[in-house]
A protein has these predicted regions:
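Short secondary-structure transition hinges
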Residues: 112-150, 190
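Hydrophobic alpha-helical connector segments
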Residues: 76, 90-119, 167-174
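Hydrophobic/aromatic residues within well-ordered alpha-helical segments
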Residues: 27, 70, 81, 85, ...
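Short hydrophobic/aromatic patch on the recognition helix
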Residues: 56-67
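Hydrophobic/aromatic-rich alpha-helical bundle segments in the mid-to-C-terminal region
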Residues: 122, 142, 159-209, 217-233, ...
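Alpha-helical DNA-contacting segments of helix-turn-helix folds
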Residues: 67, 74-81
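Basic, helix-initiating cap at the start of DNA-binding domains
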Residues: 1-42, 46-58, 72-75
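Amphipathic alpha-helical packing segments from all-alpha helical-bundle domains
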Residues: 83-86, 91, 133-161, 171-175, ...
Length: 238
């Protein structure tokens, strides 16, 4: 029986489909590692797809089967960084004493990772928001944005009664907070207010949005929602 089981396992390991899958995973790992190291060494603008394929030891045509262009390669690499930052922020937020502190804790790792390599961060934000609509790694990045916004909305609403009014306000606030993060991360390339500390400004703006959220949810929906037709969340719920 044991010999039969071992032979069965050997067959599965040597199965052509299994070997093909392992080869694909290995090539993707090599491409990811090559792209990550070259972007870190030279910066996004100074790296070519040929250099990445050479370092990964794959043909250029093979490289393009895993990522259609250099922008997708950057998204593939930096989605990993963004995802880790969101998870780190989730852990920090869980230890915060109140919703406002939790939101600030949640965004802190995103700001920190964005400062590790500002030029590449700017390129990542550009590809994330303005890349081709059908790019698969861009779709992964946008899903991470939605995850972050969902986390922020949940933190704002923690411990409070669930109402449509509060849910809409929390989603709006979460989107506004991501907009602040995006603006802060691309600020080095824009030269806006160079004398200001962008991270301190971002924290101040996030705190202001949080205060505005709590002020908003204390107002009756009929008073605050003078034109609900202008809000896509309300329209979608209808």
């Amino acid at each position: 029986m044991r010999g039969s089981a071992l032979r069965g396992n050997t067959l599965r390991v040597n199965d052509p489909v299994t070997r093909r899958l392992r080869n694909m995973q290995d090539k993707r790992r090599r491409i990811f590692t090559a792209a990550a190291s070259l972007f870190a060494e030279r910066g996004f603008d100074n790296v070519t797809t040929q250099a990445i394929s050479d370092r990964a030891d794959v043909a250029t045509g093979t490289l393009f089967r895993y990522a259609a262009n250099k922008g997708e390669l950057l998204l593939m690499v930096y989605n990993e960084e963004f995802g880790r930052a969101i998870n780190d922020g989730r852990g920090l937020a869980a230890r915060a004493v109140d919703p406002a502190a939790a939101v600030l804790a949640a965004v802190e790792p995103v700001l920190v990772v964005g400062r590790l390599d500002p030029p590449n961060t700017v390129a990542y934000q550009r590809e994330l928001l303005f890349g081709p609509p059908d790019a698969p790694y861009r779709a992964v990045g946008l899903a991470l944005v939605r995850d972050l916004e969902f986390l922020l909305a949940a933190l704002l609403s923690a411990g409070q009664p669930v109402t449509e009014h509060r849910a809409v306000a929390a989603r709006r606030a979460a989107r506004s907070i991501f907009a602040v993060l995006h603006h802060t991360l691309v600020q080095p390339s824009a030269g806006i207010l160079p004398e200001h500390d962008p991270d301190a400004d971002a924290r101040g703006q996030v705190a202001q949005i949080v205060l505005g959220f709590f002020a908003t949810v204390r107002v009756a929906p009929s008073e605050q929602e003078s034109d609900p037709q202008g809000d896509p969340d309300v329209l979608q719920q209808r």
